[in-house]
C-alpha cells in the first residue's frame, strides 16, 4: 500500500473537496471512525468515501499479492495486514448496523428532519436498510399481535416505543486539537464554574452530549 488515494471529504462550508491521502492516512481515518462509532451512544455521520477507498485499497493489495512470490516473507506480512484492515472495516459496518436496528425510528426521523447541506448519518444503502427494517418491524407487530387487539389498540408509535440514544452517557476521549472554554455542564446556572480547556494529548471522561460536535469535527477521539 504505497499509492496515494484521492479522497472526497467535507470542507468547512459543508461542501466537498478532494483530499489526497496516503494509504496509511486512509487507514488511520478508518480506525478513527471505527473507534468513534464503537464508543459513541448515537449513530455518527456516515463515511461512505472512507469505506469505498479502503475497499479499493484492499483490492489493490490482493492483486499485488497474487503477483508476488508465495515464499516471500512480505507476502505473509501483507496478508496479516489485509486481515486486520478487513476486521476493522467489517466491525465498523456491523457497529453501524446494530445502532440502526436499535434506534431505527429515531435514525429515520433525524434523517427526515436533517437540514439541507448537513452531512447525513446514513449512507444510501443504510437508509434503505433502515426503511426496510422499520417496514418489516411494523408488519411483524401487526400480523403477530396488533390485529388481535381491539381497534383502538391496533396502532403503535415506534418513535415513542423505541428508546432514544442516551446522549447524557459519559465517554472517554483523547484530545487531538486543543480546545478552549468547553462548557461541560451546559444545563447549570453557574456555567462559568464548568468551563474547561482541553489540552492536546490529554484524556478525559466527559458527558457525550457536551463534546459531540468535537467528535464530529475530529478535534477529539473517543477511546
Curated annotation (Swiss-Prot):
Keyword Nucleus: yes
Annotated keywords: Acetylation, Chromosome, Cytoplasm, DNA replication, Nucleus, Phosphoprotein
GO biological process: DNA-templated DNA replication; double-strand break repair via break-induced replication; inner cell mass cell proliferation
Regions annotated as coiled coil: none
GO cellular component labels: CMG complex; cytoplasm; GINS complex; nucleoplasm; nucleus
Cellular compartment(s): Nucleus; Chromosome; Cytoplasm
Keyword Nucleus: yes
Induction: Significantly up-regulated in aggressive melanomas.
InterPro entries: GINS_A (IPR021151), GINS_bundle-like_dom_sf (IPR036224), GINS_Sld5 (IPR008591), SLD5_C (IPR031633), Sld5_GINS_A (IPR038749)
Phosphoserine modifications at: 12, 16
Residues modified to N-acetylmethionine: 1
Residue ranges, annotated region (Important for GINS complex assembly): 166-223
N-acetylthreonine PTM positions: 2
Role of this protein: Required for correct functioning of the GINS complex, a complex that plays an essential role in the initiation of DNA replication, and progression of DNA replication forks. GINS complex is a core component of CDC45-MCM-GINS (CMG) helicase, the molecular machine that unwinds template DNA during replication, and around which the replisome is built.
Assembly and interaction partners: Component of the GINS complex which is a heterotetramer of GINS1, GINS2, GINS3 and GINS4. Forms a stable subcomplex with GINS1. GINS complex interacts with DNA primase in vitro. Component of the CMG helicase complex, a hexameric ring of related MCM2-7 subunits stabilized by CDC45 and the tetrameric GINS complex.
Family the entry assigns: Belongs to the GINS4/SLD5 family.
Protein name: DNA replication complex GINS protein SLD5
Organism of derivation: Homo sapiens (Human)
Lineage, opening ranks: Eukaryota, Metazoa, Chordata, Craniata, Vertebrata
Amino acid at each position: 500500500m504505497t499509492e496515494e488515494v484521492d479522497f472526497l471529504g467535507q470542507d468547512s462550508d459543508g461542501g466537498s473537496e478532494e483530499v489526497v491521502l496516503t494509504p496509511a492516512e486512509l487507514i488511520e481515518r478508518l480506525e478513527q471512525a471505527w473507534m468513534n462509532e464503537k464508543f459513541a451512544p448515537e449513530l455518527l455521520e456516515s463515511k461512505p468515501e472512507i469505506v469505498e477507498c479502503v475497499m479499493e485499497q484492499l483490492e489493490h493489495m490482493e492483486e499485488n499479492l497474487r503477483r508476488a512470490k508465495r515464499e516471500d516473507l512480505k507476502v505473509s506480512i501483507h496478508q496479516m495486514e489485509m486481515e486486520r484492515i478487513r476486521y476493522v472495516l467489517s466491525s465498523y459496518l456491523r457497529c453501524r448496523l446494530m445502532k440502526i436496528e436499535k434506534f431505527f425510528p429515531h435514525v429515520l426521523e433525524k434523517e427526515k428532519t436533517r437540514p439541507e447541506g448537513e452531512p447525513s448519518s446514513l449512507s444510501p444503502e443504510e437508509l434503505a436498510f433502515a426503511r426496510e427494517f422499520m417496514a418489516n418491524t411494523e408488519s411483524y407487530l401487526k400480523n403477530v399481535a396488533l390485529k388481535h387487539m381491539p381497534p383502538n389498540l391496533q396502532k403503535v408509535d415506534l418513535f415513542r416505543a423505541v428508546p432514544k440514544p442516551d446522549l447524557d452517557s459519559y465517554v472517554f476521549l483523547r484530545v487531538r486539537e486543543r480546545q478552549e472554554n468547553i462548557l461541560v455542564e451546559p444545563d447549570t446556572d453557574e456555567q462559568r464554574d464548568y468551563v474547561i480547556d482541553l489540552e492536546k494529548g490529554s484524556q478525559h471522561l466527559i458527558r457525550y452530549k457536551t463534546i459531540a460536535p468535537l467528535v464530529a469535527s475530529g478535534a477529539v477521539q473517543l477511546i
